[in-house]
């Protein structure tokens, strides 16, 4: 690992042992409720590093899901969003005292909908007060999947994973940023290093199974968006080519009362492209 930004992020965190592997966790003190930041695919909690300074004294905790970032990346392993939700519960139990609010991006939005469903079932072991979903294809049939996502889900997925290169990753990753806020060379290098940590660049075909879970558990997770009785809002980069405004419109149909902050001119990674605007939008929905 050579990027100073990655080393600094790693050195400020710790690893929490779990039954399935060590999970990287970072947290900071501040006012409650604690803000839980959940990342997406194929990146990590590193995505939120520039958001955290704008949280205006709010307590926060973030983690790398199993198989991502600086967490362990076992293989073979049947990766599941249900397991990731269990790991969130473990991290919260070891890190947080008191109430929690969630800010979730991309894949993390589906982990969050499972947490909402567990709360509806009376099975969530922590006090979740509010949630914000951001640029996640919760309603998969409304999303515009990238070609590499389709290949990784296919029988050719293991072959495609072995062929992943830094150049190919950088080109593909860069296409989901907005033209006004392009992917920088430094960000691309850091993201590639985190992907490759613990040979993670060899398992994207295993991790991509979360898309199938979005179909399998659609009734449960869409129902949670519709029926969860606490404040739920959406923060959305409107120039996202993957989780497009078509997804956002579907979420609005599921939950017409939801508060929405639209971020024009931002792509799939609004927290990287415009961290201050993203943080302010999230805080406006999560903190009284």
From Swiss-Prot:
Alphabetical list of InterPro entries matching this protein: AB_hydrolase_1 (IPR000073), AB_hydrolase_fold (IPR029058), AB_hydrolase_sf (IPR050266), Epox_hydrolase-like (IPR000639)
GO molecular function annotations of the record: monoacylglycerol lipase activity
EC numbers: 3.-.-.-
SUPFAM superfamilies in alphabetical order: alpha/beta-Hydrolases
Domain of life: Bacteria
Group of enzyme by EC: hydrolase
Keyword Hydrolase: yes
GO terms (BP aspect): acylglycerol catabolic process
A GO-annotated cellular component: membrane
Keywords from the named record: Hydrolase
Family the entry assigns: Belongs to the AB hydrolase superfamily.
Protein name (record): Putative hydrolase LipZ
Originating species: Mycobacterium tuberculosis (strain CDC 1551 / Oshkosh)
Top-level taxonomy: Bacteria, Bacillati, Actinomycetota, Actinomycetes, Mycobacteriales
Gene this chain is encoded by: lipZ
